[in-house]
């Protein structure tokens, strides 16, 4: 399966980046890291489609069999960086593509709004968001060692296995 992980945080040293990097490294996948992959602010003008970064984003999403979207929860929603990146994309890249959602929360009750926000946007581009989703709280990220904590690794594995199942069901050649 050709999986793409999109790190939706603009922070270079954030917990979302740690989780995204862990998943990408473990499964040897492509990673778009929005703390480094800088896009202009989406303005809806056609000439933005000609920008090299925008073309690259579209190509990498199109090429993927499945996507993992990760975002911190900012003010009860996904990060502005992720929403901006998604605004450059459409059903042309996402239609029927399986997508897994993962939110990284700052406290014990966050994350669900970011998941719902991502789910709504993905529905708008006709992606197939898988049923399983995850919220990672601070206890799930080992910041000191820049990895995820042992207590969440199995849940991440199950998320990726479900994503893979949906990718294979939609494209038996995967």
UniProtKB/Swiss-Prot annotation:
Assigned EC number: 1.7.-.-
Keyword Nucleus: no
SUPFAM superfamilies: Flavoproteins (SSF52218)
Entry annotated with the keyword Metal-binding: no
Keywords from the UniProt entry: Flavoprotein, FMN, NADP, Oxidoreductase
Classification via InterPro entries: Flavoprotein-like_sf (IPR029039), FMN_Rdtase-like_dom (IPR005025), NAD(P)H-dep_reductase (IPR050712)
An annotated Gene Ontology molecular function: FMN binding
Induction (UniProt): Part of the yhcYZ-yhdA operon that is induced by the two-component regulatory system LiaS/LiaR in response to cell envelope stress.
UniProt-listed Pfam families: FMN_red
GO cellular component: cytosol
Binding sites annotated in the UniProt record for FMN: 9-11, 15-16, 73-76, 106
Cofactors named for this entry: FMN
Its biological purpose: Catalyzes the reductive cleavage of azo bond in aromatic azo compounds to the corresponding amines. Requires NADPH, but not NADH, as an electron donor for its activity.
Record's subunit section: Homotetramer.
PANTHER family in the record: CHROMATE REDUCTASE, NAD(P)H-DEPENDENT FMN REDUCTASE LOT6
Family per similarity comment: Belongs to the azoreductase type 2 family.
Identification of the protein by name: FMN-dependent NADPH-azoreductase
Organism expressing this protein natively: Bacillus subtilis (strain 168)
């Amino acid at each position: 399966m050709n999986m793409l992980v999109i790190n939706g945080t603009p922070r270079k040293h954030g917990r979302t980046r740690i989780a995204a990097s862990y998943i990408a490294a473990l499964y040897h996948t492509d990673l778009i890291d929005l703390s480094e992959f800088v896009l202009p602010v989406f303005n809806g003008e056609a000439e933005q489609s000609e920008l090299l970064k925008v073309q690259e984003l579209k190509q990498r999403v199109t090429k993927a069999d499945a996507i993992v979207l990760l975002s911190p929860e900012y003010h009860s929603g996904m990060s502005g960086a992720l929403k901006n990146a998604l605004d450059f994309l459409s059903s042309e890249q996402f239609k029927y593509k399986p997508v897994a959602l993962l939110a990284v929360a700052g406290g014990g009750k966050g994350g669900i709004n970011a998941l719902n926000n991502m789910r709504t946007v993905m529905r708008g581009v006709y992606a197939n968001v898988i049923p399983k989703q995850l919220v990672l709280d601070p206890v799930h990220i080992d910041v000191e060692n820049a990895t995820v904590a042992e207590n969440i690794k199995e849940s991440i594995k199950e998320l990726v296995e479900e994503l893979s199942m949906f990718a294979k069901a939609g494209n038996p050649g995967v």
